[in-house]
Amino acid sequence: MGAIAVLFIVFGFPIVAGVFGIAGHFLFKRFWVAPLIVLITSLILLVTLASGNSSFIFWVVMYTAIALVTSVATLFLRKFFE
């Protein structure tokens, strides 16, 4: 795996998961929909791109957690400022 791929896994995907958590909350009006989509997408990518390597399950959990945290934070901030 190249250096660019590692940087994208460590920095790129978490940023995308966070942005998707925020956008998903505004689009779907539920805090759990975006993390669920991130989880399903990450699992599909784990099986297809990483050939089912179970060591990448850590990243699947991290991306889902990041999406969940940003979605819940957006929920609380939205209620706080309304």
Curated annotation (Swiss-Prot):
InterPro entries found in the cross-reference section: Uncharacterised_YbeF
GO CC annotations on file: plasma membrane
Membrane recorded as keyword: yes
Transmembrane portions of the chain: 4-26, 31-50, 55-77
Membrane association type: Multi-pass membrane protein
Chief localisation class: membrane
Keywords: Cell membrane, Membrane, Transmembrane, Transmembrane helix
Subcellular location: Cell membrane
Keyword Cell membrane: yes
Protein name per its UniProtKB record: Uncharacterized protein YycQ
Naturally occurring in which organism (per UniProt): Bacillus subtilis (strain 168)
